[in-house]
Each structure stands twice: as C-alpha cells, then as structure tokens.
Amino acid sequence: MSDDVALPLQFTEAAAKKVKSLIADEDNPNLKLRVYITGGGCSGFQYGFTFDDQVNEGDMTIEKQGVGLVVDPMSLQYLVGGAVDYTEGLEGSRFVVTNPNAKSTCGCGSSFSI
C-alpha cells in the first residue's frame, strides 16, 4: 500500500525505522512486523507483536521505508484509526499502539478494553 493512501492504521516513521534495523539484524529481508490482538491482559484484550515472513489471505500490509507492517482482519477491526509507533524513554524502548477505539487501557499500555 502506498503512503499516499488514507490507511485505517498508521505505521509511524519511528516504528518503521526500528523495524528496518531489527530486520537487518535478523538477516531476513522477507520479515515484516505483525501486530495482532488476543484476549487476555488485565483489561480484556492485549496487543502482540512478532516478526513474520508470511502474509496470509485477508491480511493488510502497510509499507514504509521499505519494510512492512502486517495486520490480520480480525485484529484490524479493533485497530482502525490507530497507530503503531516506537518509543524510547526512561521506561525502556518498545512498540506501542495508540488506539482510539480503546475505552480503557492498563498502566503498562499493552492491554485494553472496548
């Protein structure tokens, strides 16, 4: 997908830059960052991130800086309007999801409710 198209989920420059660096370390240019949602966590749903070299039927792929972010259709419905970012701070570095659909989030930011 092109950066010029209005996307249901944003993939920030900071996240793409970090993914690019991590993929280079893995020496597998086919890897993409997959973001997904599972049941669990202290608020009912939790975000997950993994590297994947497969894109399944129905998955949405967002390309930025030559790397891809992949989301399955079930997870995407909970992420529409959100963004995947990468932050570094006093609490460490991590990928984070900004999700306007979340009614509440836990203190760590990895769990949410709808």
UniProtKB/Swiss-Prot annotation:
UniProt record, GO biological process:
iron-sulfur cluster assembly
- Function of the protein: Required for insertion of 4Fe-4S clusters for at least IspG.
Organism, scientific name: Citrobacter koseri (strain ATCC BAA-895 / CDC 4225-83 / SGSC4696)
Q: Which residues form the signal peptide?
A: none
Subunit-level organization: Homodimer.
TM annotation in the entry: none
Task: Give the family this protein belongs to, as stated in its UniProt record.
Answer: Belongs to the HesB/IscA family.
The UniProt record gives the binding positions of iron-sulfur cluster as C42, C106, C108
Which cofactors is this protein said to need?
A: iron-sulfur cluster
One Pfam family from the record: Fe-S_biosyn
Q: Which UniProt keywords apply?
A: Iron, Iron-sulfur, Metal-binding
Q: How is the cofactor bound?
A: Binds 1 iron-sulfur cluster per subunit.
Query: Which HAMAP family does this UniProt record tie to the protein?
Result: Fe_S_insert_ErpA (MF_01380)
What protein name applies here?
Iron-sulfur cluster insertion protein ErpA
Q: Note the PROSITE patterns from the entry.
A: HESB
Q: Name one GO cellular component term.
A: cytosol
Q: Molecular function terms in GO for this entry?
A: 2 iron, 2 sulfur cluster binding; 4 iron, 4 sulfur cluster binding; iron ion binding
> Origin, by domain of life?
Bacteria
